[in-house]
Amino acid sequence: MSTVEGKKQEKRRALLDAAYELFLERGASKTSVEEITSRAKVGKGTFYLYFADKGAVTQALLARVSYQLLDDAVTACEHTAGLDSFPDKMIFVIDHIIEALRKDTLLLRFLERSFVWPGLDQIEASGEAEPLMRKLFHTILASPEMAGRTEREIYQRITSLGSMCMSVCYSSILEGKPDNIDAMKPVLYDIIRKAFG
């Protein structure tokens, strides 16, 4: 990477880091572009070189945070013995994400119900895909539970279940509705097993 490219990446990262800190402290709606650029120590014009508006930086952060949560969960899954079926692996990953969000309710408030399954709908089994997503895609396609399903059906099922889990996670952890998260986990995991059975 050239020095110029490296500096561009540093500025973009500084903007994302500043926005993330401010969003956690104050909330996205109460944070201005000026506050983000001030914290990042860059000019306001620099912000608009990288992001069209505050919504674009929010989407980039949602993708970054979701990716990190997913990467951590997948790595933990790979290092855990006894997870033989795809539903077991899916439940492990979802549980890992739920526990991370239970420990960090500020992060959960930021994500709200907007977990982003990074590029799952655009993944191809080729070497072009991002490594984490390529690995996930191969695992999903190789599982017997997915036999006979199209890539679109797999995507729809996984994102629907993931969205449902995030919504229940948010409501259960922050609001105690419809029940606390420990009471809701068996319900969620039963739905996941049935969806892939």
Model regions and ranges:
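Amphipathic alpha-helical packing segments from all-alpha helical-bundle domains
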Residues: 71-74, 100, 119-146, 152-159, ...
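A secondary-structure capping/hinge motif
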Residues: 55-57, 106
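Hydrophobic alpha-helical connector segments
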Residues: 60, 74-103, 161
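Alpha-helical DNA-contacting segments of helix-turn-helix folds
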Residues: 51, 58-68, 72
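Hydrophobic/aromatic-rich alpha-helical bundle segments in the mid-to-C-terminal region
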Residues: 109-112, 144-191
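Short hydrophobic/aromatic patch on the recognition helix
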Residues: 41-51
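Amphipathic alpha-helical segments used for helix-helix packing
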Residues: 88, 100-120, 170-174
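Basic, helix-initiating cap at the start of DNA-binding domains
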Residues: 1-26, 30-39, 56
